[in-house]
Amino acid sequence: IKFIILGCGSSMGVPRPDGFFGNCDPKNKKNYRTRCSALIKTTDENILIDTSPDLRQQLLRHKIKKIDKVFYSHMHADQTHGINDLRSFYINNRKPLEVYADKATSHYLKQNFSYCFELLITTTSL
């Protein structure tokens, strides 16, 4: 099993869109951080934790071409607004992705991204 941190920046990323780095040194490449997402990779499955708005960039950078399941930690924008990028995995497999979230997050996702749940995704509330 591998655990891959796809992003570990703040809710606005580092640097922020206005160029602010906070206490991070802009000369250090490691201080350019995308928003939080992670991947659990097993021999059979790729399990994504959260879909940050930077998800497309993260998946391309790590050459991830398959997602089987998605777990959402909570319903904030920096954990959920990359959900649209999951559509390509349905297009490739024609199989709905399994999504796991608590009831509040599940409701939020279905209310705000209903088009993703028509065929693409099945949800289980935790």
Where are these regions (language model features)?
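Binuclear metal-dependent hydrolase catalytic cores
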Residues: 1-126
